[in-house]
């Protein structure tokens, strides 16, 4: 009869700030393939058989907790948080989690929240190693790497038994030459872990409570079972934007391989010129091209297939798929696209909307103004809060010269209107649908210039009969 695996709880360490990310967002909430990295770690723990997951939060705890609740809230108490009030080391972080662990859990799986490539199969192997380890109170993953800089080194005795871990900053020159390292994945028996955490001290180079020190205690209490990881890449932690990008490429590769095997062709790329500047927390999606002196502000999003040349995009703006823009500016919180075309000298101010199949040229669209569908807006000034309906055309060219159109704040331009420049439409004015405007419209006035509708009863029947007879001849 097969032995039942040990019931376990996972503890995920996610309290760190991640200063090398240079971001206001907590490190573990940075996304890969559309999901925060932390969610991949939680998924791996659950897939490896954890009955519940305790995530230790600290920096940005409200944001992290909210993100977890949104993603895993439907699972009730299966995923919950524990607060680490001060960053006093990984050992202290696990201490903070202990009161939140169910008393029925016999083992505790400890993971880092910045390792989104974790393979659940490797975690399952670790679980099996602890079950086979007899009296050993802990099992851990180790990895052989070519450059161990920054990692804790695995210390073994003459017989090859693991006797401890030495953090890089505390290691001697001889110990730093060791290439077997600690990737930070442990599975410890609950009773042992509680006692070991109580025995931790801050007698080290960083003055912190090192979780790694529990391995030396385990070696004296029955041994530490070590499983050498076959896939070292899956254990890599994310500390900066370059590592985030590399990990995302791995994840995209996994997704692409799966889809390609099902018959899908996938091509992904982004091209960014050397002169382009992009601020923290901006998102540049696939197949985006950023050229020249383009600037993208903090938190802005440039979506799939967009091409921007010498464009300033302010903080929080959204450029939706397949937008083309050049020598223009997009204000904070503005929304552009999809399928918009901003030609040179377009100025889209804060919170304005330029929608699908709208073209602008030498036009100012002031704060909160909207042109959401099918319009040409050339040589114009559209006032704050004005609305330009679908099918509106600024008739700005007489064959020899360009002329300007001015629309006042809060004005409403009905669909399928033609504005023959030069012309001014006053603040709060209303242009009826289908109107051709050739003269100035005063403030709060209604301009209507369409032909009066006439209904001829029975005419359609007679017309169709006549056309049918003509077709027979």
From Swiss-Prot:
The keyword Acyltransferase applies. Coiled coil: none annotated. Residues 1-241 are annotated as: Pyrophosphorylase. Its EC number is 2.7.7.23, 2.3.1.157. It catalyses: alpha-D-glucosamine 1-phosphate + acetyl-CoA = N-acetyl-alpha-D-glucosamine 1-phosphate + CoA + H(+); N-acetyl-alpha-D-glucosamine 1-phosphate + UTP + H(+) = UDP-N-acetyl-alpha-D-glucosamine + diphosphate. Residues 263-473 are annotated as: N-acetyltransferase. One of its GO terms (biological process) is UDP-N-acetylglucosamine biosynthetic process. The active site is at 373 (proton acceptor). InterPro entries: Bifunctional_GlmU, GlmU-like, GlmU_C_LbH, Hexapep, Hexapep_transf_CS, MobA-like_NTP_Trfase, Nucleotide-diphossugar_trans, Trimer_LpxA-like_sf. One of its GO terms (molecular function) is magnesium ion binding. Binds 1 Mg(2+) ion per subunit. Homotrimer. This is Bifunctional protein GlmU. It comes from Sorangium cellulosum (strain So ce56).
